[in-house]
Amino acid sequence: SRLKHDAGFPADAIHYCLREAGIDLSELSAVVFYDKPLLKFERLLETYLAHAPRGFRSFLMAMPVWLKEKLYLKTVLRRELRALAGLDPKAPLPKLLFSQHHQAHAASAFYASPYQEAAVICLDGVGEWATSSIWHGQGNQLRPLAELHFPHSLGLLYSAFTYYCGFKVNSGEYKLMGLAPYGEPKYVDVIYRELITVREDGSFALNMRYFAYPVGSRMINQRFAALFGAPPLTADAEPSQLYLDIAASIQQVTEEIVLKIARYAQQLTGASKLCLAGGVALNCVANGRLLREGPFQELWIQPAAGDAGGALLAQAFDKCFVTVVNNGGMPIEHQAPCNIPAHAA
């Protein structure tokens, strides 16, 4: 569509893939979507209930799109696929599967990599509940080892500073990374003291007294701005040295957390190679430091590490995943015989 972050149905992309493969829709064994909408809706409801009555306006704004479309995504996808293929409304379609968000990230990273064994780290804003996860890939098996849940999120922390420095959330994070070299990391201690507690294994907890994103329309609150002594920068304003230093500070904190998570992942897996996925994996400065200072001999980053790359899991998902779920709803094992090699693209 040539529209950045286009949220519409990817008809052109589907047409292209089918054309390149020389097949039509009826020849597909499955269509896989990279999210579980009902789990995500569960997270939204639990979060709004936990913060009520705060966030009521945000709740009212969010619900229409869920009640009209997102909760019925399977029906929407079937309708769009039939229209795309020019099929009768009752014509059969390939089976429709839904993976968990971080499951999609991990599969897209490991199964597209050149490795037969690797640690896999997924870092982003949030999927259904998970915000950070560690996996171990071996041959055709991909096993989750650890994960961190919303609202504690490295991606959302970085997005909060993206917003504070005048850039658009979920779009301008690369600009914040580019701004960082022009500043000095003077506020690293402030961030660690007030905003985030980080453990040696890389797990962390955000001080939610400073953030509004769980139920608000903004990422941060007035307490966050007061911490740095200035309001959020407007989009058209020239950043002063304060904002340059803040950008440098959150970039350094992000790099240090990524390094700790990587060291823990290496301890858990014993692997010498690492695959990365999730939006945070697009932070090339952190990736460079991870390659130089991290515990892994080789690093492979999913080229479309953000949500756009979730579709890469599809070719491996149907044959390679058997999900066992414990009482807490977390996937604890994903392993099954599979004839798709781990390096398949």
Indicate residue ranges for each PLM-predicted region.
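Short acidic/glycine-rich loops and adjacent helix/strand connectors
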Residues: 1-318, 323, 329, 342-345
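Short linear/disordered segments characteristic of secreted peptide precursors
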Residues: 329-333, 337-339
